[in-house]
Amino acid sequence: MILTDTNIFIDFWNNPTEDLKNVFIKEDIAVCGVVRAELLHGAISAKDFANITTMLEAFDEFNLEIPDWQILGDNLYNLRKKGISVPFSDAIIATIALKHGIPIWTGDRHFLLIQSVLTGLNIYQTPNRL
């Protein structure tokens, strides 16, 4: 199982390379609420919105529960103590991945910064993605 970041879906839709196709075929893909919302936010029509919604139904989804918000706050605090500021959405995604012990598939370098402090975070690597 890998938690897939928004940028991977966008890359795949814009340029469906063989390496991306193979991961989508071979791996169990998961999303989280942040990724769902970001993808739906990018819809350009009602049809596009419906297609994205249908596509997302194919994947497992992980989200934060009430106690996890304290953990997210702890993670953000620990990052800030090291002088690292990352987008709030990326911190949520990282916290979800850490909670469930699953790697994040991303092309976003913010996750390397997060990983430098939250060393339990695993990043799923594919060619040309970090």
List where the protein language model places each region.
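A secondary-structure boundary/capping signal
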Residues: 5-6, 35, 107
